[in-house]
């Protein structure tokens, strides 16, 4: 067996092959059977019920690349144990949209979804409840996630009851360039770093963030590829864009592990 190191073209080809296989496998979408209510934010998310009797916050394809970012960031957050909404793919039928004119803006077909987190603030809030011991690790892991993918804004919500656990949702504007990112935005991005102001505002220290590095270190290249392969092909993310996104995430993971 040769010990020759893999060349970059070989790495790119391997990633591409793995991504294409992951896209082909896909996951069976959860069928949405009822719309509950909606929010008036840019992506116009909707609270809906699935055929599995669970409730989801969904964003349709009319939200553009926001749903790609949302799906990928949520999967990466889950991979390091950060408190994010549990992501999945759902299916919205034309018939269901036709039944309720309030949601006529939704695009039928597959959509991004996260499992609804009940009894939380209905809108995003500023940094809060940092004095709750239960939130220290949660904030630290979110800061690590934000540094890894690059956060253009902060999306914190909190449980209404003590200890007011923090969650991060709505990541459509993450990555350099936000929902309009192009390959060059990722290729030209600076090295990953932790937002020290955010660390300070959360009443943490860099050492608190470093405690999460073993979780980031445990994220395999395969896990990153699976996250990037998750958005269905009809969401418009090309295979070349996916390869660039994998390269971006692999590199930035290494940047942060050097903290």
Residue spans for each PLM region:
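Conserved ATP-binding subdomain of kinase catalytic cores across diverse folds
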Residues: 16-125, 148-152
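Charged, low-complexity, helix/coiled-coil-prone segments
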Residues: 4-22, 79-88, 153, 167-173, ...
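Conserved kinase catalytic-core segment
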Residues: 125-180
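A generic secondary-structure micro-motif detector
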Residues: 62-63, 135, 235
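Regulatory N- and C-terminal appendages and interdomain linkers associated
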Residues: 1-36, 51-53, 69, 166, ...
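A general structural signal for short secondary-structure boundary/capping elements
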Residues: 94, 156-163, 212-219
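Short secondary-structure transition/capping segments
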Residues: 2, 6-8, 108-110, 129-141, ...
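C-terminal catalytic region of ATP-dependent kinase domains
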Residues: 166-259
């Amino acid at each position: 067996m040769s010990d020759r190191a893999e060349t970059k073209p070989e790495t790119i080809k391997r990633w591409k092959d793995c991504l294409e296989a992951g896209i082909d496998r896909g996951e069976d979408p959860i069928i949405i059977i009822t719309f509950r209510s909606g929010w008036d934010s840019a992506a116009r998310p909707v609270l809906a019920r699935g055929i599995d009797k669970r409730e989801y916050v969904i964003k349709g394809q009319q939200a553009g690349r926001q749903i790609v970012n949302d799906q990928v960031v949520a999967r990466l957050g889950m991979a390091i144990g950060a408190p994010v909404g549990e992501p999945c793919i759902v299916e919205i039928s034309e018939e269901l949209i036709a039944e309720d004119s309030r949601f006529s803006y939704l695009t039928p077909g597959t959509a991004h979804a996260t499992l609804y987190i009940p009894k939380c603030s209905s809108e995003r809030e500023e940094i809060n409840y940092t004095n709750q011991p239960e939130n220290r690790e949660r904030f630290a892991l979110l800061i690590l996630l934000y540094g890894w993918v690059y956060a253009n804004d902060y999306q914190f919500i909190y449980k209404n009851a003590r200890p007011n656990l923090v969650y991060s949702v709505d990541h459509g504007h993450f990555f350099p360039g936000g929902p309009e990112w192009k390959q060059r935005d990722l290729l030209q991005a600076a090295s990953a770093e932790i937002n020290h102001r955010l660390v300070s505002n959360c009443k943490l220290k860099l050492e608190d963030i470093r405690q999460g590095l073993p979780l980031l270190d445990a994220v395999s290249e395969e896990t990153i590829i699976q996250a990037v392969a998750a958005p269905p092909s009809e969401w418009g993310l090309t295979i070349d864009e996916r390869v660039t996104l994998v390269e971006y995430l692999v590199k930035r993971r290494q940047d942060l592990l050097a903290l």
